């Protein structure tokens, strides 16, 4: 359920940004020296890796990402730990948001440019942030020992 809500939120945010702000040219400073609105299309996966050109590459990438999203969704469904389930839910929600972009636009619409002054870091979107936050929650759950006798109900 969490994944569906996050996917819808990511989808709506991406569509709003894409259709309302993408018509404006250039960047918009959101947080001076740190974060700008800077729209771009990412034809690859993370950081432009596995850049695909053409319909066959896009279809293969969509199929692989759909299978991986399904597996992570299954892990969320099986989890009895709320922190872990929330992490998996964020990962699935973000993945589905990006999958929607890739399936219907041919690429992922990234629009948040993170930088430290003149040092460029990366461009991402809300879905990417959800995936990263989910991965962080999963790592915290794995690294922080559970209290003996504690239950997660």
Where would I find each of the regions flagged by the language model?
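Alpha-helical transmembrane bundles and membrane-interface segments of multipass inner-membrane proteins
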Residues: 1-153
